[in-house]
Amino acid sequence: MGAGRAVPRAPREPGLRPGSRPLRTAPPDPAGPFSYSGGVQELHDTALAPLTTFRLGGPADRLITATTDDEVIAAVREADDSGTPLLLIGGGSNLVIGDKGFAGTALRIATRGFELDGTRLELAAGEVWTDAVARTVEARLAGIECLAGIPGSAGATPIQNVGAYGQEVSSTITEVIAYDRESRETVTMSNAECAFSYRHSRFKGDPERFVVLRVRFELEDAAGLSAPLRYAETARMLGVGPGDRVPVDAARETVLKLRSGKGMVLDPEDHDTWSAGSFFTNPILTREEFAAFHARVVERLGDGVVPPAYPADDENTKTSAAWLIDKSGFTKGYGTGPARISTKHTLALTNRGGATTEDLLALAREVVAGVHEAFGITLVNEPVTVGVSL
């Protein structure tokens, strides 16, 4: 199957390998903003804010909650057949929804399923990501332990090519099971066909086409040790060097401590976590762009200041969005309104309670303009915007 198009596979139960056990399922979290006993739930003129980690966003004309793959597909087909705009919601940790809400059907994917067969892992799209990571660590498997604490659902991870602390899901995902709205078939896409890149994928590049149903991973049995540590701060906290391995549970716990210290682990009592985590991606610059950027750094900050630089590939260099924001004068806690920069991490924009989406966007635009004025770099938002834009 070429990278240009997903080809329908022969009909079979979606997401199961021949001879594998069915996914163990569990009902959605009863502590969530909408509780129900199973099956499709339909609500009308319902606020979407409780379904996002920003706690922002107006109402949807209709909100459907689906707990099985068949329910997800049926809801998508119904919307497509009627020409109704469709918004997919998983954990809501990467969404910025406009104050006017969504004029269409919002589909909350609340499927559950965790299947571990040796080192092969299969997750239903609605599976809570942090729980799944914890269970793989309990099984002493390596590969996603440094992605602990990232809010949201498993189905969102390939879309964004979620990554943190030296790991990206693209390094362990083998296949993604998705519903193709164009062919109206369930398709199985290989890692290569997902076209992963930094915080991007084929799914993000063509958001109207695919609905992720299940995600398959190949993890590593390293006798209870982690994957080689790629993030210097993690290695330093563990007293080892980059490239070393440590007990997999120690790697996870260290990442959780790092994330908590930056307000990146959800806590309803901590407004620093009323966010989407990192609001901007780290810029990737060509050699010419980096040279121009470095000249601006010297001009603004002096010869002794060296900007962060990490090889993105053979031709390009990645720099730090958080560093750019800070050096442009936007410090931790910046802002006077109900939307402010986190008090723990300059890369997170937060709702301090009572904010509107427009408050958040005004802050984001101010940061983007300030960084561009200071260094000539235009930051790009990481969360998906719905009904609004920067």
Language model: regions and residue ranges:
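Compositionally biased, low-complexity flexible segments
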Residues: 1-33
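N-terminal low-complexity, intrinsically disordered patches enriched in charged
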Residues: 11-15, 21, 101, 135, ...
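Anion-binding (especially nucleotide phosphate/pyrophosphate-binding) glycine-rich loop
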Residues: 36-183
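Phosphate/pyrophosphate- and phosphate-bearing ligand-binding catalytic cores of soluble enzymes
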Residues: 43, 50-53, 186-349, 354-358, ...
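Residue-level signal for inorganic ion chemistry
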Residues: 68, 92, 152, 184, ...
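Generic structural marker for isolated residues within well-ordered, non-membrane alpha-helices
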Residues: 132-133, 321, 368
